[in-house]
UniProtKB/Swiss-Prot annotation:
Alphabetized CDD domains for the sequence: AdoMet_MTases
EC number: 2.1.1.-
InterPro entries on file: Cation-dep_OMT, SAM-dependent_MTases_sf, SAM_O-MeTrfase
GO terms for MF: O-methyltransferase activity; S-adenosylmethionine-dependent methyltransferase activity
Residues holding substrate: 149
Disulfide bonds, paired cysteine numbers: none
GO biological process, one term: methylation
UniProt keyword list: Methyltransferase, S-adenosyl-L-methionine, Transferase
Protein name: Putative O-methyltransferase Mflv_2199
Organism classification: Bacteria, Bacillati, Actinomycetota, Actinomycetes, Mycobacteriales
Amino acid sequence: MASTDEPAAASGDSTARARQAEAIVNHAEHSISEDAIVAAARERAVDIGAGAVTPAVGALLCVLAKLTGAKAVVEVGTGAGVSGLWLLSGMREDGVLTTIDVEPEHQRIAKQAFSEAGVGPGRTRLISGRAQEVLTRLADESYDLVFIDAAPADQPQFVVEGVRLLRPGGAIVVHRAALGGRAGDASAKDSEVSAVREAARLIAEDERLTPVLIPLGDGLLAAARD
């Protein structure tokens, strides 16, 4: 006969695992230190109301850029340049970051951050415009890393374009892939959640891609292309 204590024990184990997972993520998020230039860019991001990746997400972007030997990178969502600085720190010294943002003011501020970091003008290509239009003008299989930090509603379209841009051996990274956990909540049906799930489906069903969901920031969906 099953013990009546089993459901309570199972619930307790689940709660303990959830707390442990939260503690691990919290430790990861606070284990990365940023230099003064990135910290200043982060402060400017707050001033202009532009989102910025967490230090742990930035460090992961740096690692992915190093692992892919990234020479050509596309970023959707320049913001104040925080993620761009992290990407550049992991790219090859002759690498070029193409970063797209619809807000010219964001790009002006990001350009300041890049200059403060000693990044030469030839290493960045800042394009002001709608990513929906800009991405379609970029060449197929010409980029080592694509980073998408955009509104959830735009993720499916940007994933399609981003995968098209990837060279074999490259990687695509989608920020805000968890929406604070809502993306994994079966009861959540709103348009943002639906769009994020569609982006994840597109990646999961592409046989050329090997994906992983990483619980940093607001969730990162990363995938390597064969």
